[in-house]
Amino acid sequence: MSSSRFDSNKQLTTSSLVIGYALCSSLLAVINKLAITYFNYPGLLTALQYLTCTVAVYLLGKSGLINHDPFTWDTAKKFLPAAIVFYLAIFTNTNLLRHANVDTFIVFRSLTPLLVAIADTVFRSQPLPSRLTFLSLVVILAGAVGYVATDSSFTLTAYSWALAYLVTITTEMVYIKHMVSNIKLNIWGLVLYNNLLSLMIAPVFWFLTGEFTEVFAALSENRGNLFEPYAFSSVAASCVFGFLISYFGFAARNAISATAFTVTGVVNKFLTVVINVLIWDKHATPVGLVCLLFTICGGVGYQQSVKLDKPIEKVSEKDSEKGEEDEELTQLVPGKLASVV
């Protein structure tokens, strides 16, 4: 009886974590688009997100609800290059959402396997992709090309940011894995270092982009009031959901299998598209949406083909656990914290 009740409670907890992760992941890109639409200061917006995550991790750590590595300058110096790459990925992502719709963001986010496959073959001397993997990459590329060709809101500025985002997020995916392997930090330690260092980097970009002059001009024009009601609510939601996806992402990854986590991530993309279409008119044309779905489906095929391509080897239990931990950190840290889907 008690065993049955325990299993029931565990299942309920797991379901709650998965639902929480799905809601945060599917809503975050749309919420960020709302935030940047009503609060057109990408540098300040991301700084508020970093501040929220940093303070939340610190307070939860002080209360004993989570455990994170202490902040030390020696570790910070080692982690700084990864934090810069992380900041650039979030910076380009926010500016992409500033100039383009959510669908364009998802298309370019889905193109990352193509760049990773090319980089692995050219720079790391990895073998050419299998037929199934190659076919999946072709589907991704075809969907992306079709989307761009039918995008009625195409602008050079938006697609310049899209290309910059594609390069930085691909670099981050590779580089964060390298940093995780060489700097021993737990999950919440990574969250703390990523966001605190990014918060320190933010003022540099405020001055380089000239955004600080826009903020001061808006403050003087609005008598010190920078937030309108819509802006305040969307920015607050963006900050809260940015932190929640860190928590639910890590917790859900621990509670379910890697395959189930991947499937959940794919479903989240479809939910994002549906939500974006339902709430307003800032989305792609019907033909563009079909091309977007092709790109997402190609990404699903790529993920499955890569799993099939992996050789089955006998490894020790210790090595297996370490590999799973590194894979978990690699999947969850890049592109998830504070701002992106």
Swiss-Prot record:
GO biological process, one term: nucleotide-sugar transmembrane transport
Highest taxon listed in the record's lineage: Eukaryota
Cross-referenced Pfam families: TPT
Region (Disordered): 316-341
Subcellular location field: Golgi apparatus membrane
Miscellaneous notes: RNAi plants display dwarfed phenotype with severe developmental growth defects. Cell wall composition of the RNAi plants shows a considerable reduction of the fucose content. GFT1 down-regulation also has an impact on the levels of protein fucosylation.
Functional note: Acts as the major nucleotide-sugar transporter for the import of GDP-Fucose into the Golgi lumen. Transports GDP-Fucose in a strict counter-exchange mode. Is required for proper plant growth and development. Also acts as a GDP-mannose transporter that may be involved in the import of GDP-mannose from the cytoplasm into the Golgi lumen.
Protein name per the record: GDP-fucose transporter 1
